């Protein structure tokens, strides 16, 4: 009896144990279904060779960009210079056309005089051929009128020639031969530029080419801004070098500090805002 009761108890205990299994034990989860979403640090770690090549590429791109910007600014200045030269040439062409028209009009005005004189002489000779005395008087009157018209025509020619060739000597183009001449011409053009507020009109007023002034500008700027550097460059000797070579040496003598002063004076219109024709 005791054995049967113990078996029944164990069976009951077993049954209760089997029923309580799903509630007491934790569910078994497969660890393979969980994946890490955070990236590994090893994936972002690049080799040192790749990093150095990328840095070199960025430096080269920056250098090319800087060179492109400098070239763009130089081209912009060149365009402005060419536009001013174009305006100057247009003014010269307009002046030439207007002077040619005036000469043609003067020529046309002076031409009909002899024709009228010939017509008057022919009419007087043909209309009164029957009367010798009247014919002679008409011929003498025609000759007097012809001589008077001839004198007027000569006076007109003389006045036109004086107007054509009587240009003031101050407006004639002069060739500078030394540094003092370059400085004197530069100051004259600068004064005209400050009055007229136009580079092309200032060059036209003094009958000087823009490129000629630009090639000798470093000499004048060195004498105005930094005359103490003239000892480094030396005096100009026409027997040893040309004026263009001396101007290039003056350009190379302009250091960064002097160039900053020059640019500041150009912005304030105290120097001619003209670009250099030399390169370092």
Swiss-Prot record:
Keyword list, A-Z: Coiled coil, Nucleus, Phosphoprotein
Coiled coil segments of this chain: 63-101
GO cellular component: cytosol; nucleoplasm
Basic residues biased stretches: 152-168
Compositional bias of kind Low complexity: 133-146
Biased composition (Basic and acidic residues): 103-121
Pfam families: CCDC106
Main location: nucleus
InterPro entries, alphabetized: CCDC106
Highest taxon, organism lineage: Eukaryota
Region described as Disordered: 103-176
Motif (Bipartite nuclear localization signal): 151-164
Post-translational modification Phosphoserine, affected residues: 130
Compartments where located: Nucleus
Subunit structure: Interacts with p53/TP53.
Functional note: Promotes the degradation of p53/TP53 protein and inhibits its transactivity.
Protein name: Coiled-coil domain-containing protein 106
Organism name: Homo sapiens
């Amino acid at each position: 009896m005791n054995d049967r009761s113990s078996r029944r108890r164990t069976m009951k205990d077993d049954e209760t144990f089997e029923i309580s299994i799903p509630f007491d034990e934790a569910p078994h989860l497969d660890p393979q279904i969980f994946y890490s979403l955070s990236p590994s640090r090893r994936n972002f770690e690049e080799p040192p060779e790749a990093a150095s090549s990328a840095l070199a590429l960025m430096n080269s791109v920056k250098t090319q960009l800087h060179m492109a910007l400098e070239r763009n600014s130089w081209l912009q200045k060149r365009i402005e210079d060419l536009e001013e030269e174009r305006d100057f040439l247009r003014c010269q062409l307009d002046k030439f056309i207007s002077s040619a028209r005036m000469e043609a009009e003067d020529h046309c005005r002076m031409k009909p005089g002899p024709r009228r004189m010939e017509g008057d002489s022919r009419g007087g000779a043909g209309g009164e051929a029957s009367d010798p005395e009247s014919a002679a008087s008409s011929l003498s009157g025609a000759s007097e009128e012809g001589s008077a018209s001839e004198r007027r025509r000569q006076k007109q020619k003389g006045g036109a020639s004086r107007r054509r060739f009587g240009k003031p000597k101050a407006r004639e183009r002069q060739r500078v031969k030394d540094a003092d001449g370059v400085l004197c011409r530069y100051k004259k053009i600068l004064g005209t530029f400050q009055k007229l507020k136009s580079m092309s009109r200032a060059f036209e007023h003094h009958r000087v080419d823009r490129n000629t002034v630009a090639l000798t500008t470093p000499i004048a700027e060195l004498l105005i801004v930094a005359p103490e550097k003239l000892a480094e460059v030396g005096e100009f000797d026409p027997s040893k070098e040309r004026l263009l070579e001396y101007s290039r040496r003056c350009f190379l003598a302009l250091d960064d500090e002097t160039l900053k002063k020059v640019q500041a004076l150009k912005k304030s219109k105290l120097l001619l805002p003209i670009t250099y024709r030399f390169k370092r």
